[in-house]
A protein has these predicted regions:
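N-terminal basic/disordered segments at the start of proteins
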Residues: 2-38
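DNA-contacting interfaces and partner/effector-binding or oligomerization modules
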Residues: 30, 37-144
């Protein structure tokens, strides 16, 4: 990836991380998305987690971060789910598990997820006008 492409990706991540939801329900949705970050760590995401969790009442939920993300994704993929919470969760999943790739044919967003969550998240993205494809890479589920 060229230097300008890396800078663009970093700028997009920083812009997404700068959006702080006003509603408590949206903050909790985004936190659920960010808690399961895999091996990724960057300053923008860490700052967002700190800002979102600093002023909210965190209620202990049972399950691993991956299980909590799948539960939240399932709730927000429902057609009647609040759009504001769905957007906050999707933004968090992009920050936590997303990568932006550039090729000759254009650009695409990839999310590295467990297959169960990828299927549910594809529905949630479709509800906000971003239909995607599910692909399995290297034996792991991946949603584009």
């Amino acid at each position: 990836m060229s230097q300008s492409a890396r800078e663009l990706v970093a700028n997009v991540r920083h812009e997404l991380a700068a959006v702080l939801p006003e509603r408590p329900c949206c903050r909790e949705a985004e936190l659920d998305a960010l808690r399961d970050s895999g091996r990724r760590s960057d300053v923008a995401t860490a700052r967002t987690v700190h800002q979102l969790s600093g002023d909210s009442l965190v209620i202990a939920a049972s399950g691993t971060p991956r299980e909590l993300a799948l539960r939240r994704a399932t709730m927000l993929a429902a057609r009647r789910a609040p759009q504001h919470c769905r957007s906050a969760f999707l933004r968090g999943r992009i920050l936590a598990r997303g990568s932006l790739s550039f090729a000759r044919g254009g650009s695409h967003l990839e999310l590295v997820l467990a297959r169960a969550e990828a299927i549910v998240l594809a529905q949630a993205f479709a509800h906000v006008g971003f239909p995607g494809q599910l692909r399995e890479r290297r034996g792991r589920g991946r949603s584009e």
